Amino acid sequence: MKSLLSNLKISVPDKIFLKDPESSDLGKRIIKHSILLIDDIGFDSFTFKKLGLLISSNESSIYRYFESKHKLLLYLTSWYWAWIEYQLVFETFNMPDTEKQLSKTIEIVTRSIKEDFSFSHINEVKLNQIIINEYSKSYLTKEVDSENKEGYFVIYKRLISRIRDMILKINPNYKYASSLASTIVEGALHQHFLKDHFKSITDCNEDLTPTDFFKDLVFNAIKS
């Protein structure tokens, strides 16, 4: 799987960027160091000026790739969900058992992230922390409906649709497949956040993981 993934290009909706950052060394440095900087200081404090100083490049050169830091965040979140989707597809492709396929999918979507060295300019562990802490800022905006129409969230929605379809294969009569699928994806981020910051209001910890919780939740729901 790793060798196969290394030959694949993660595709992000092209309306999100002005110039594909994967097309140049500068673009890849923008992505690499934006992840490190946002993880370090948070998205609210992040600016293109600070990023430019970090990569020794003019602020204006960053604007050639992204028109705003919001678009950069959309790029990073889209890349992340596409990366998760690739793992889901390749790790479940040869699984004829639908329950095992869904169980593996829940594991992929909810597990703690390890760095994937197939993409040398992207630290997936730090990117995962950005998704946990900052993802909601990519869509909790006044422009969410227009951006949705432009296809900015197509990868995220496609991932949830894949999970929904797996749920329906197991129980075609389950009425809440889309709601459950989106709860797995969003809820996993929330449980990881609670595990790190509000330990008293989650049962998830080092021994009982979000993966354990969501497997229990999902299979009890669809088999009841």
What name fits each language-model region?
Residues 1-11, 124-129, 134-140:
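Intrinsic, short, N-terminal disordered tails of RNA polymerase sigma-factor systems
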Residues 173-181:
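Membrane-interface starts of transmembrane alpha-helices
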Residues 91-125:
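Hydrophobic alpha-helical connector segments
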Residues 17, 22-47:
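Short, amphipathic alpha-helix enriched in basic
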Residues 100, 130-169:
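Amphipathic alpha-helical packing segments from all-alpha helical-bundle domains
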Residues 1-11, 157, 161-169, 182-224:
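C-terminal peripheral helix-coil segments that are non-catalytic and often amphipathic
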Residues 44-71:
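Helix-turn-helix
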Residues 32, 36, 72-93, 104, ...:
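Alpha-helical structural segments
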